[in-house]
């Protein structure tokens, strides 16, 4: 029972101390309030009577002066805050509300596509698309075309893209060619509504198009992809045409060289009346050798008859005639080797004929090589034909961006106002603590 009594007594003393402390604080606040009212009235009287003042030696007067100074600082801080709200916070709030009211809500349509060839289709990946074969440049070329002024002009000419955003139902800050020079640059406005992002890791390009409605955003995105596909097909066809045309011209040139070499060969054959002068000369030498053999045999037989005293033999006249005929034929064949037939003789034109035949063979080999290269070039051109492949069709979603480019300056003023507000609060708190 003694312990419980001690606890009870301790609680009563604690409650009594708390009550006395509370009463003391209330009394102190009441005294300070009464003192402030007294000092305010005294301060008002001091404006009419400048000689009135407090005694510096009085401790209560010093305390009252300190409270008055602190009260004045509090009033100045409150006045600064009111001015801050009136001249900065309130205008910024009005501007922000106007920005929300004067900007339109847009829908954003996203589509994913790639640019590839038949050769890279089988083993397509992000690395093969952008890493090998300089495929990255092809993707960036399509991106630059979509974001070019040429595409902007075509979209405006065929679809009225910029005119669509200049309608009165679009808010002032989001409208194209709005009053006061807002959104007056057509190309910059076009880039604010059309963008293309390149994902190097995935090897894809993502198209983003904004419009007032989801259906219109998807329509514009689909048309941009169609124009980009036409551009890729046109560039690819032009590259193939130029390559094949060059190869065909090379084949044509080789064929013309072959025809010229064969024509020169036919001319020399026509002049010499020989298909192959070398074979003709060989045949002449064989004829001369055969005639000389027969002539030697006839002369030997004739001499044998004469040695035996058979000069009256009936074979003698026939052998004599044979010898004369053989000698005449040998002479004619030798004249064929030495005399000129037309502009060249057979022996003299042999080197010229060999040169022409060699040139003809070289021209034929070059023509066959050019023809084979043309066939390979056509196959390679088919494999390297570029085309635009759409991975995902345009799908529209609500765009969370509500501000046009003309309202970006608002963020700067908001940050500036917040900085000024925080600085003013810190200064006020410091003055109040002093």
Curated annotation (Swiss-Prot):
Biased composition (Basic and acidic residues): 1-50
Subcellular location per the Swiss-Prot or TrEMBL entry: Cell inner membrane
Residue span of region Disordered: 1-58
Keywords, sorted A to Z: Capsule biogenesis/degradation, Cell inner membrane, Cell membrane, Membrane, Polysaccharide transport, Sugar transport, Transmembrane, Transmembrane helix, Transport
Topology with respect to the bilayer: Multi-pass membrane protein
GO cellular component: Gram-negative-bacterium-type cell wall; plasma membrane
InterPro entries linked: Bact_polysacc_biosynth/exp, BexC_CtrB_KpsE_VexD
GO MF assignments: carbohydrate:proton symporter activity; protein tyrosine kinase activity
Top-level lineage group: Bacteria
Mitochondrion keyword on record: no
GO biological process per UniProt: polysaccharide transport
Membrane-crossing residue ranges in chain numbering: 84-104, 409-429
Function: May form an ATP-driven capsule polysaccharide export apparatus, in association with the VexA, VexB and VexC proteins.
PANTHER family to which the protein is assigned, alphabetical: FERRIC ENTEROBACTIN TRANSPORT PROTEIN FEPE, TYROSINE-PROTEIN KINASE
Homology family: Belongs to the BexC/CtrB/KpsE family.
Designated name of the protein: Vi polysaccharide export inner-membrane protein VexD
Organism, scientific name: Salmonella typhi
Lineage: Bacteria, Pseudomonadati, Pseudomonadota, Gammaproteobacteria, Enterobacterales
Gene that encodes it: vexD
